[in-house]
Design a protein with these regions (language model features):
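Membrane-embedded beta-strands of outer-membrane beta-barrel proteins
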Residues: 95, 132-134, 197-199, 286-290, ...
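Extracytoplasmic loops and strand-loop junctions of Gram-negative outer membrane beta-barrel proteins
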Residues: 59-60, 78-79, 114-116, 176-185, ...
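Conserved small/polar residues in nucleotide/adenosyl-binding loops
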Residues: 345-346
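Membrane-proximal, glycine/serine-rich, low-complexity loop/turn segments characteristic
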Residues: 1-194, 202-217
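Long, acidic/polar, low-complexity amphipathic helices and coiled-coil-like
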Residues: 121, 236, 259-306, 313-325, ...
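Outer-membrane beta-barrel translocator domains and adjoining extracellular loop/strand segments
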Residues: 120-126, 156-162, 235-242, 316-324
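Outer-membrane beta-barrel pore domains and translocons
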Residues: 79-83, 112-114, 148-150, 202, ...
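Surface-exposed loop/turn segments flanking beta-strands in extracellular/periplasmic regions
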Residues: 162-175, 237-272
Length: 347
């Protein structure tokens, strides 16, 4: 868990793209809500599960980045921004509500909606992200729980019909750069639902006085449990369509010769007119851990950690057998973990 200051000055409100709040080294598809990837290899997301969602890492909520608030007064933040012409518009909607029931117990709701109609044909993206969180941080017992929903709809245009469409400065763009999958109406829809709860109980090895705000600076042993349910799915749809390349080749006189009836996909199986392909992945994770604190967290030996874990994986994707049988086949796998570590302070 990382403690972050609450930005009440709206210092970064003008930065629509979330990855620009960390730096400028990102390769983005282009518009708000669309996929991006850091140039720095060491900053790239490394998903052990749900790798097909890595491109939207800067937008999605996860167990690791769900915010929790500890407030003296109710906090409410609402924002709506839009920019660009109507046919290329980008929209950014943000809603945050936080309130403490008691000095140690609070809840909050965060909702983000970011999207664009895009500068190219068939490039609209809608990115919706919701987190609902509850926390309690007492002297000995603490619990953090949350629900996450990520929903992403993106149109897949397949790229420009030819490099000339973006390289030739004499080419006018009255209604968007022509793309290969515009007539195919290709879309990808991502859905994610997750629930998690992480709790721990501290057993101090020295008496706790009224002046002790917490037992973080006392010798103590912490026993904890972490549970997470996380499921992701992706559905791809399209219809069989063609595109035209107005500059497919040149004739003997050097003039451009157009070519129509071009297809993005060369082969069509099962259904000759449309496609529906899906993938689903679910992980149920359980962890039990213990943490010994011989002196305090800033001591020569800060903490000695250890624990065990069990992950239950479920996978399914559309295959030819699924079409013949009329149902999806699911594959289940289990992962077991035993881990330990020692944290210390450099002198």
């Amino acid at each position: 868990m990382h403690i972050n200051p609450l930005d009440t000055t709206l210092a970064t409100f003008r930065i629509d793209y979330p990855f620009y709040k960390e730096g400028v080294g990102h390769a983005a598809v282009g518009a708000l809500g669309q996929a991006s990837l850091p140039y720095n290899y060491f900053e790239r997301p490394q998903y052990r599960n749900f790798s097909f969602a890595e491109g939207f890492d800067v937008y999605t909520y996860r167990m690791e980045n769900v915010p929790f608030y500890n407030l003296k007064r109710p906090y409410f933040h609402f924002m709506y921004l839009e920019s660009g012409q109507k046919k290329f518009r980008e929209e950014n909607f943000s809603l945050t509500l936080g309130h403490n029931i008691s000095p140690t117990t609070g809840f909050n709701v965060n909702y983000r909606s970011r999207g664009t109609k895009g500068l190219y044909e068939w490039s609209r993206t809608k990115n919706h992200n919701l987190s609902v969180a509850v926390s309690h941080t007492g002297k000995r017992y603490s619990v953090h729980a949350g629900f996450i929903n990520n929903h992403i709809e993106t149109r897949e245009n397949g790229g420009v019909v030819g490099e000339w469409a973006i390289r030739d400065t004499t080419f006018e763009m009255p209604s968007g750069v022509p793309m290969k999958l515009t007539s195919s109406e290709a879309t990808n829809t991502y859905r994610n639902n997750a629930f998690f709860v992480e709790q721990s109980y501290g057993i101090p090895l020295l008496p706790v006085t009224e002046s002790d705000f917490s037992i973080a600076n006392l010798p103590a042993v912490f026993i904890g449990h972490s549970f997470e349910y996380n499921s992701w799915s992706k559905v791809y749809k399209d219809i069989r369509g063609t595109y035209t390349d107005d500059r497919y080749e040149r004739d003997a006189d050097g003039n451009f010769v157009p070519q129509d009836g071009l297809e993005y996909y060369k082969n069509w199986f099962i259904n000759p007119t449309q496609t529906r392909d899906s993938i689903y992945e679910r992980v149920i994770s359980n962890r039990v851990f213990i943490q010994a604190q011989p002196w305090d967290r800033n001591g020569v030996v800060g903490t000695v950690n250890g624990g065990v874990g069990l992950d239950l994986h479920t996978y399914s994707q559309f295959r030819l057998d699924s079409y013949l049988n009329g149902k999806y086949d699911k594959v289940g796998k289990s992962s077991y973990f035993v881990y330990g570590s020692v944290s210390y302070t450099h002198l």
